[in-house]
């Protein structure tokens, strides 16, 4: 179902309350990475240029319903002012007299940022009273926070009970690309999964078994699969309570004709730290006790590169190893390069949020793939085939069009 977007509505003179994702990393009151603010700019600018009064809502961190100065959005307001080249009015409140007054006196093109939504306990509880207070400030709600789309909160879901909600450009882009991975993906379709735990990716594997041609498994989760097949994995991280499940997934894949590609070698060490002695060991030979696999090995890199080659749709979620440490970063880097190469040949490539997004940025390949998702948990749930509350609450195309 297509969703209404900010393009579909007349904004002139309208008060627009916009849920953005300004949950940026901070250190000592300074923003260390403003990517999320930059990504919200196109929607904010569009609203300003089309004569709207813009009221922005965002959370930052997890203050758990308490006013904590280190979670204030004041530094965000300053950075946003610089990026927009115009003053952003910051109000250190969420509702009440001061907020009502400022909004009432605002002119077309003005931008107001309210304080951290999570300073009120009602935000994460999706409190209808809180949602109503925000809805009363505006004519229309714009949801541009994909990162919280898997949460039903007052600022993204509750508010849509009172005023119409439409998607911002970032939300629209996320839905468009992630839908390509879950609905009629162009074939061959290859899914690359990594990260530590099978349990985090069960939903994705199960949902994509029917759709993908190949699923490549790296990261620490590979050892649960390998152990389920009887291989000796030494002291590698294994979810022993998921061994039967891993075996079942491999059997299901066989039945469905989906190829699951498991690593054939691994880079091992006795400790997870830089500068330690490393060994590359073939999986068939088994890992000695005390040694753990911390990256895919060179033979696996080659195997994965060949599997990725020629794909028309690629989804990648989760690193191949402990990529933050140089000695264990090669697998993740090589997979990132292989995916970038296929993108240049016309493949649609989608990188799940979180660690994979951090990895692709680290290796300077962010602009060499089709789409890097801004939401870790949200992109994972979308790929699991779940309906996300923050998307469900956005009006459908045919609903308010006339």
UniProtKB/Swiss-Prot annotation:
Disulfide bonds: none annotated. It comes from the Bacteria. GO terms for biological process: gluconeogenesis; glycolytic process. GO terms for cellular component: cytosol. Monomer. This is Phosphoglycerate kinase. ATP binds at residues 201, 293, 324, 353-356. Its EC number is 2.7.2.3. It catalyses: (2R)-3-phosphoglycerate + ATP = (2R)-3-phospho-glyceroyl phosphate + ADP. Substrate binds at residues 21-23, 36, 59-62, 118, 151. It is found in: Cytoplasm. Transmembrane segments: none annotated. Pathway: Carbohydrate degradation; glycolysis; pyruvate from D-glyceraldehyde 3-phosphate: step 2/5. HAMAP family: Phosphoglyc_kinase. One of its GO terms (molecular function) is ADP binding. Keywords: ATP-binding, Cytoplasm, Glycolysis, Kinase, Nucleotide-binding, Transferase. It comes from Thermosipho africanus (strain TCF52B). Belongs to the phosphoglycerate kinase family.
């Amino acid at each position: 179902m297509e969703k209404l977007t900010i393009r579909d509505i007349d904004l002139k003179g309208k008060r627009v309350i916009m849920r953005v994702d300004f949950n940026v990393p901070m250190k000592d009151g300074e923003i260390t990475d403003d990517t999320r603010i930059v990504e919200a700019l196109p929607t904010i600018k569009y609203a300003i240029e089309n004569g709207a009064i813009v009221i922005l809502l965002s959370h930052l961190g997890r203050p758990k319903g308490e006013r904590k100065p280190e979670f204030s959005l004041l530094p965000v307001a300053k950075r946003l002012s610089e990026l927009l080249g115009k003053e952003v009015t910051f109000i250190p409140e969420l509702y009440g007299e001061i907020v009502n007054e400022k909004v009432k006196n605002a002119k077309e093109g003005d931008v107001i940022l309210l304080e951290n939504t999570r300073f009120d306990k009602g935000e994460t509880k999706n409190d209808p009273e809180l949602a109503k207070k925000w809805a009363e400030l505006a004519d229309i709600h714009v949801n541009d926070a994909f990162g919280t789309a898997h949460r039903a909160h007052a600022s993204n879901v509750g508010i849509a009970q009172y005023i119409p909600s439409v998607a911002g450009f970032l939300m629209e882009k996320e839905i468009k690309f992630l839908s390509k991975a879950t609905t009629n993906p162009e074939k061959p379709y290859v899914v690359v999964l990594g990260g530590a735990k099978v349990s985090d990716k069960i939903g994705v594997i199960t949902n994509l078994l029917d759709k993908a041609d190949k699923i490549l498994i790296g990261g620490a989760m590979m050892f649960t699969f390998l152990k389920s097949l009887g291989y000796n994995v030494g002291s590698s991280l294994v979810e022993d309570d998921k061994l039967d499940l891993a075996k079942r997934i491999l059997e299901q894949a066989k039945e469905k004709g989906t190829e699951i590609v498991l690593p054939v070698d691994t880079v091992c060490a006795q400790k997870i730290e830089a500068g330690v002695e490393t060994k590359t060991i073939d999986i068939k030979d088994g890992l000695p006790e005390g040694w753990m696999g911390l990256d895919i090995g060179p033979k696996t890199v080659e195997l994965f590169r060949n599997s990725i080659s020629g794909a028309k749709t690629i989804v990648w979620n989760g690193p191949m190893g402990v990529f933050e440490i140089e000695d264990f970063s090669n697998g993740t880097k090589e997979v990132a390069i292989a995916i970038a190469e296929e993108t240049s040949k016309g493949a649609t490539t989608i990188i799940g949020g979180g660690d994979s997004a951090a990895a692709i940025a680290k290796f300077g390949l962010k602009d060499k793939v089709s789409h890097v998702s801004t939401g870790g948990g949200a992109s994972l749930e979308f790929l699991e085939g779940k309906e996300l509350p923050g998307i469900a609450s956005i009006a459908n195309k045919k609903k308010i069009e006339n």
